[in-house]
Every structure is written in C-alpha cells, then in structure tokens.
Amino acid sequence: MMRYQWWLYLVYAIGLMLCLGPSYIHPDEHFQCIEILAMQFMKVKGTIPWEFKSKFAARSYGPLLLVYGPLFTILESFPEIQDNPALILYSMRLQNYVMYLLCYHFLIPKLIRDERKAVQFIKKSLLLTSYVTWTYQTHTFSNSIETLALISTLTVMEDMVNEKNIQRSNFKNSVILGLIFSFGVFNRVTFPAFIFLPCLILFWKFYRVHWKSFSLLLLSFSFSSCLFVLIDTNIYNNGKGFVITPLNNLKYNLNVQNLQVHGLHPRYTHLLVNLPQIVGPVLLLAIFSGYKLDKLSTYAIISGLLFLSFFQHQELRFLVPLVPLLVTNLNWTPLSSTLVNKKIFKGTWLLFNIIMAFIMGISHQAGIIQFLGDYFHFRTEQMGVHIWWKTYSPPTWMYMSNNLTVSSLINTQDGIESIDEVAFSVGNHHVIDLKGCDLPLLTETIRRLRLNGSITPLTLVTPNSMTSELKKLKRDGTINLIPKRNYLFHLDLDHLDFNDFTTFKPGLTVYSIELL
C-alpha cells in the first residue's frame, strides 16, 4: 500500500510539472479561451478570433465564464498575479489539472466498478500515466472541458440504465443530465457526436417508459440553453436577434469552403493517424481485447469516431475526450493481462508517454510562452514593433497592454499571402504576426516599416530552425540582426526540411533589427 501511494504521488508530481510547463500545443488553447477572457476581465487588447466576432458568433461565452470566470474573479484580488501573464496561464492550467484529477478519482471508478480490483488498478494507472492527462487535459482547450462533460454524462447515464435503477423515475439524474447536455453543446458543437448513440440506448432502455423524467430532462436542457443564449446575445449584441452559437458553428463547419481555410484531411485521419498518436501502445490492447458492447462508453467511442470522421477537418485534439474511454472500457481478457505484464509493453508505454510528454508538455513552441512571460519583467514604454515569423501566433493577451495594435498576414481568395492589412504607420506597441510566410514577405515588411519612418525598436522573434533563411536576409546588406534573447526549449515541428538539417535546430531567438 505504501509503495502504491509513493508511486501515485510521483505521477501526480510529474503531472504537476508538465502542467506548469511552457509548451504551446495549439493556438486555440489561447485564442478560444484566455485571449477572450483576458479581454473581458482585464480590459487588455488582443486578438479576437473569427469564432468570437459578431459576424460569426460561433463560440459561446457561457461555458468559459462558468469554468474560468470564478478563477479570474479570485485573481482580481491578487494584483501581483493579475498583472503577470505567466502566473495567470499557469493558474488556469493548474485548475484544469485539479478538475481532471477530481474526475479521475470520483467518476472514472464508477465506469469500471464491475472490474476486478487488479484490473481497475491497471486501467487507472494507464490513464494516469498517459501524456494526454499531463498535457492536453491541463491546457485550456475546450476539448479538455469536453472530456469532463462527457465522463460526467456517461457516469449519470450508466447509473440510469443500471438494472437496479431502471424501474425508478430518476428525476434528479434527468435534471443533471439536461444541464450537462446543454453545457456540453454550448462548450463544443462536437459534444452531441460523442453522446448520440448512448442517448439512443438510454432512451430505449429508460426514457420510453419514464416520460415524466424525459420531460424534466428536456426542461432542464431548455432552461440552461436559454441562459447560455441570453448571455451570448447580450455580449455579442450584433443586432440579429437571439444568438445561438452552436447552430452558427455547425452552419460554418458544414460548409466545406470554410473548412478549407483551416485545412482539409482525409476522412480516415482520425482512425489511422490521430488515434495511434493519442493512445499509443494501448491500441494493441484494443486490437487484441476489443471493447465491452454492454457499456454506453463503447458506443460513445463508436459514435464519436463515426461523426467526427464525417467532417474533413480532423485534428488530434478532437479525440482527447475519448482517451479515458479508450483506456477504461477495454474488454479485459487473460491475453490483456499477459500483454500488460510484459516488460516490452511497460517499457514501450513509458517511453511513448515520456517522449510525447516532453514534446507536448515542455518543448513544443515553448519559446513563445517563455519570451512573453519574460517580457512582462523587462517591458518598457518603447516596445516598438514585434515581428513574429515562422512561429505559432503569439497569444497577444500576454503583452498585458491596453494600447496594443495587432496586425496579421492574410490569405487572399487566390490563396496568396498578403501584408496589405498590416498597419505600417503604427510604430509602437505593435505586434505583427507573419505566421509561416516566405522570406520575401518578411523582407518586404521590414522595408515598409523603414519607409514609413519607424524609429522605434524593431524586434524579430523567430525559431532557430530558420537559421539558413536568416542568413539570406542578412545578405541583403541593409539589415543586421542582433541576438538579444535565446530560449533553448522551443521545438518547431512545422518547418522541418530533410534537405536542410539546420531546420531541426531547437530554440527560439529574439533579435533586434538594425537598418543599415
């Protein structure tokens, strides 16, 4: 028992360390969450993503305010934290980590209570040592919150279809289920994809003979949904009547032309590419052992994969809510025990998760967060112009400025990148996000800033993987780059070129630009 407790504390500590790591997994963890909240609560200027523009109104403020609003309210009482973007970021990640651990301790056991103690221990151990638990679940993705909503839903539903409870009316659970359904839908429009098949089974087994309970579920869902609609209508205030964000989001995503902007993938991407990446060696257990067909969780897996694969924009994080189900719902057989107890499986599982945890929890695009966290300490009135090139979009809320101008590269209808909308006349407190544009556009940006008479500091933030490209920039003879700061733990996986091994160089460097 003592040995188990020490092992548990060690895993918790590893999770805490990675939770507080500087990695930056995907722009949406900032722009669909903290960026919006910081602008609401702290009145800083930042980047409004398309989903939160009144024209689209495709994301609900309700779940964000419900999950993170209390934390921001508490932080208002601590100015030393409220003014420090790194502390705000890590506070939010810590909250997510704690919420997931609570779910792990109180809800996951209910999904595996029919298993033998030894099997429960193995499944819980696999889930706790998954890199997804340490990274994706702690970052501020809507997918992370969707996981909690899905597990909560399935826990309640499993309880309702239990033979002991099937004859009861279950008014309380019906009300709870309606509230979670509403929250899940307004948090992410993909939530119904996971619960569609489980809902059909629940209706057939329970609600077709308990119509009063079904009425309560509908009433609860409608009431909470109306509250979310009123919140969004008040905030967006776009003059178009009531704002129903899940409906707007669904309409947007059903248009293939819209999805092309974000990237189209083959429909098998989730099944053949993303699934192996997200569960690793557990996939072997799934292949050899299969899943329990008498559990609603299995149908949530099938339902989620089926409906999410229908859409051609398929990112790995969309499958994050399935990870707990893919692990805990395995059909445990003697072959499963034999495989898990083999040293090669244990070693492969640990190696897979250590590597993925290092990438996703510590080094992936981490220089961005480190620089903006440091910038808080050395910022001055003469910020000048910060040009970001070949990095993920900087989370501009971390500048903590109420006087910030953000310009960005745009793609024209012909797919051509353009800097025509960059505010070259703004020479101070200006962030220019050039994303992954080619070198000529970077050169043109610097040239036009110079032509507009910019005498304030010009700063270039770019990964060390661009060493070869920067040498070409210097050959121009009119530009000199002086390294000011360097961050070793920055992994750029987006610009790897096997014909140029300098693109594998880790790190991010902040340069001062001198115009000769």
Swiss-Prot record:
Documented EC number(s): 2.4.1.-
InterPro entries found in the cross-reference section: GPI_mannosylTrfase (IPR005599)
Metabolic or biological pathway, per its Swiss-Prot or TrEMBL entry: Glycolipid biosynthesis; glycosylphosphatidylinositol-anchor biosynthesis
GO molecular function term, any single one: alpha-1,2-mannosyltransferase activity
A Pfam cross-reference name: Glyco_transf_22
Function statement: Alpha-1,2-mannosyltransferase involved in glycosylphosphatidylinositol-anchor biosynthesis. Transfers a fourth mannose to trimannosyl-GPIs during GPI precursor assembly. The presence of a fourth mannose in GPI is essential in fungi. Involved in plasmid maintenance with SMP2.
Family: Belongs to the glycosyltransferase 22 family. PIGZ subfamily.
UniProt protein name: GPI mannosyltransferase 4
Organism: Saccharomyces cerevisiae (strain ATCC 204508 / S288c) (Baker's yeast)
